[in-house]
Amino acid sequence: MSGEQKSYLENQLEAVAEKTDAGYTFTFQREKIKLLDGLEANVIKDINPFFHKEIDVTDDEVIITIQPPSSYKAFRFMKAKDKKSKWQFAYQLVQAVQQHNLSRLNLIVAPENIVFDKGLTPYFLHYGVKESIPPYERDEERVWQELKAAAALAVDGAFAFEDYLKFNETLTFSAEAKAILDAESYDDLLELIQTHIDELEAKAKTYIHIPRKKWNIQRYIGLGLIVLLVPALIYSMYALFFAQPKHQAIVDSNRAFLNKQYSEVISTLSKYDAESLPESVQYQLATSYVEVENLGSAKTKNIENNLVTLQSDPQHFLYWIDYGRGEYKEAISIGRKLEYNDYIYFALAKYKQQLLSEDTNDEDIQKELDSVNSELEKAQKERQENKQSNSETSLVDTSEEQTQTDEEKQAEEKAAEEKAAAEEKAKKEEQKEKEDEKKETEKKDEKKDDK
């Protein structure tokens, strides 16, 4: 023990205090204590007779061994108790010290010297014997300060025992601990503790107390219900904000289609992905795009009679929806899936017009335009070869091909004109800048000559 820091109890007793299998032992050096005869220590056995106590006196040492009942706990276990139990223990500790009236036995109220039973009643392990075993004398002030520090430790527990005992004026304690340490009498301290107990009891009455097992069962049932309700809540939110508006849009578009209000059908369904719509609605939307597209009556009739019917592959519906929405790349992809050259050619022609309307000076757009031109030539060649066999279902006739070619030429010419105009404008601006620079230089030269 010499290499270890001694506890407050050991310093006060000038002894070694240990917890062993045999119980709590206090070892005193005979040369340091006033004990003359071992019989003088037997008075310790008279208090708390249900503690098993042994006193061994040798030439050099006095060893006192104390074994409380196995159900008793050391002071340090008070930290695990609930708040009300801590205050009740503190109350009984104050009473135990206040009611101690044995003149030959002297108290030392240190945490290492205290145990408590299941009723939270505190008991002291060691007592000093007057003029024989430390502490020798009754020191009211020491006991009072030790009591307040022990009560603060039991209730608060944020600091060590000696911090509460010695540093009340320098350390910042909790309001509860500070109130205990500032108490001026036993009655004041008991009243303070009783007030806190009453407050906790009043607060406890506002709660419903149930067994822990029942609480755990209810908690897990509640968690299970939450887990089950989350998907239902998500579905309800989806139905409220997405499914219901979508269903209403389908109903409205169907009414508009029956009334041949094709533009209304298109606008009503514009924000919904085509593949998410039922096939019958896809058919109505595709037909609406065919009707509003400037295809000519013959071609429109040909498409509706042969390609876009309720018995058609839904890919035909998706083609015309993508085509009508200006998503020509997707339309080209569907045409390739269907291996229908007219679809490919028609979407490529529109895609080319779309590219020509953009900035053809952009390198990426120009590459894409070259690729489209190449595909158009290939598709046109294949159509020429298969014209006779596909004449009945041909989407684009010869006159329309010429019209599309003319439109493409016009778009190309327009793009070329815009490009030439932009270049001419750039040249003029560059020339103007040069002239301005020349004039500025001449002015500077004139100023130099004047000087």
UniProtKB/Swiss-Prot annotation:
Pfam families: YukC. Keywords: Cell membrane, Coiled coil, Membrane, Transmembrane, Transmembrane helix. It is found in: Cell membrane. The chain crosses the membrane at residues 221-241. Residues 376-386, 406-451 have a biased composition (Basic and acidic residues). Required for YukE secretion. Probable component or regulator of the ESX/ESAT-6-like secretion system (BsEss). Required to deliver LXG toxins to target cells. This is ESX secretion system protein YukC. It comes from Bacillus subtilis (strain 168). The lineage of its organism: Bacteria, Bacillati, Bacillota, Bacilli, Bacillales.
